[in-house]
């Protein structure tokens, strides 16, 4: 799905009404930074009032019934692939953005919180 002046919002299902997401323009520039967002009827409404946003990913499924804005477009069946990272990788390469693999640390959106399972099976 490609149109001028449309924003793109990939979503990964977190838990409850939370998603890991960001919003990008056609050139893949950050409009809203990567983060963990709790979804309600006002999520991204400031952007939706002015532009259409295409929502995709397994997190968008649960948002479809909550975000009812006329500019919200939900696309199903998009499966993320490594080839989808090509444009971002090429841009980083052209800009000389390389990671020092000896000191690189993964980017975690949230701290891990261990919980004890409620049903203990022996």
Q: What feature does the model see in each segment?
A:
Residues 1-80, 108, 113-114:
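Surface "functional belts" at beta-alpha junctions
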Residues 75-122:
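Acyltransferase
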């Amino acid at each position: 799905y490609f149109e001028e002046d449309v924003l793109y919002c990939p979503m990964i299902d977190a838990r409850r009404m939370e998603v890991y997401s960001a919003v990008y323009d056609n050139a893949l520039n950050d409009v809203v930074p990567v983060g963990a967002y709790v979804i309600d009827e006002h999520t991204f409404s400031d952007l939706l009032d002015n532009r259409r946003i295409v929502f995709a990913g397994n997190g968008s499924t649960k948002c479809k019934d909550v975000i009812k804005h006329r500019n919200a477009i939900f696309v199903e069946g998009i499966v993320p692939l490594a080839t989808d990272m090509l444009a971002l990788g090429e841009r980083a390469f052209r800009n000389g953005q390389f990671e020092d693999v000896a000191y690189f640390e993964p980017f975690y959106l949230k701290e891990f919180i261990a919980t004890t399972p409620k049903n203990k099976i022996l």
